[in-house]
């Protein structure tokens, strides 16, 4: 870049500061303000802009000063608590007697410091003086305080001593920044060529247009080849934004959002869903079992027990064996949010029902790139007369289409509480078909004991896995980490 092009790229304030520095070579802000004729803030802003262009440099020195707190002022007059006591301690004295002579707070503070400094020791509740209690560095530092705040050198104290006083909240630290602006060789060379001080217009205003004054004004040139610094506005966390998008889709489709407790009885988490009591998913290695129990609902327990043991009053064999009421009453951290929807159906057995729940579930998983002990699930149910399996497929396909997945397919699946069952999959470029959850029609063994007569379509979809696909992540753990760089650069939407 030529000298002229560099000069053309300088603002008038930068030129004024550079000319001032040419004469001063180096200056503090006050002197620079005086010499350049600018306000101190404007002068320093110009100095920093010159530093970016390597025409000046701004150095900064931080000076630490210390002053006494209110408590420090008091101890400067009366002496530190340990000094007050050791001066009065001619012979061994019980701590109880000391508390009658001094405040309990003073004795409490002093005891530790007396032992630490080796001035006294405590034996069986007796304070015994030991050694010579000469004036310590902390006492000398306290005595040196007078008037304004002081530096370490002015106090004649070392860092360790002042650090102890800071911990005891007897002094406070004040930091004062001193800046010095200096001209560089490149700045000197440019200034020596001569700088033209001419007022420039940075903005074309309506007043300039109306008056025609813009014709005689010089406009500051703009460089369009410089990439501006990125500005990161506030935004919702990408994962939270996707969850809100899913919520909005189901609300727009006429669903009611429901919530439920994190702690559920095994009855609602497993038994009401016709999951056998010896199912592997109920083992300790898969479920967070709690030490508490609860009362299971009497109006359903008998029917659920019969359904498990012999199939109840429908054409089913059940699971056989004896249903354990005590096991059903044990509390767990819910392993799926289906426990919330089945309980909601039991409370609302009459159609129509359209409900969904987006919340956390908990399983004893080893943390790795695709598993965490806590994860979000999107659970939903539709209960109404004449509902069919085809309605379920259409509903799920519509949801995934609205989430931006063009290709959706369904594979046969198996779950203890739905029949028929499917696993929805979406097609992702570079990955192929990806499974995202499970769905099906609730079995009679689930609905009959709860007094539900209409068909129930149900699904449980993996929220975090779907989020990983949408956000292009390969590690599930990144969804829960506060990586500020990733959060700043995350897309609000795709255009």
From Swiss-Prot:
Keywords recorded for this protein, A-Z: Aminoacyl-tRNA synthetase, ATP-binding, Cytoplasm, Ligase, Magnesium, Metal-binding, Nucleotide-binding, Protein biosynthesis
Named cofactor requirement(s): Mg(2+)
Entry-linked Gene3D superfamilies: 1.10.10.2320, 1.10.10.2330, 3.30.1370.240, Bira Bifunctional Protein, Domain 2
Residues reported to bind Mg(2+): 419
Keyword ATP-binding: yes
Record field: catalytic activity: tRNA(Phe) + L-phenylalanine + ATP = L-phenylalanyl-tRNA(Phe) + AMP + diphosphate + H(+)
Pfam families linked: tRNA-synt_2d
Keyword Transcription found: no
EC number: 6.1.1.20
PROSITE patterns xref list: AA_TRNA_LIGASE_II
One BP term from GO: phenylalanyl-tRNA aminoacylation
Record-listed L-phenylalanine binding positions: 338, 377-379, 417, 442
Subcellular location: Cytoplasm
Assembly: Tetramer of two alpha and two beta subunits.
Family the entry assigns: Belongs to the class-II aminoacyl-tRNA synthetase family. Phe-tRNA synthetase alpha subunit type 2 subfamily.
Listed name of the protein: Phenylalanine--tRNA ligase alpha subunit
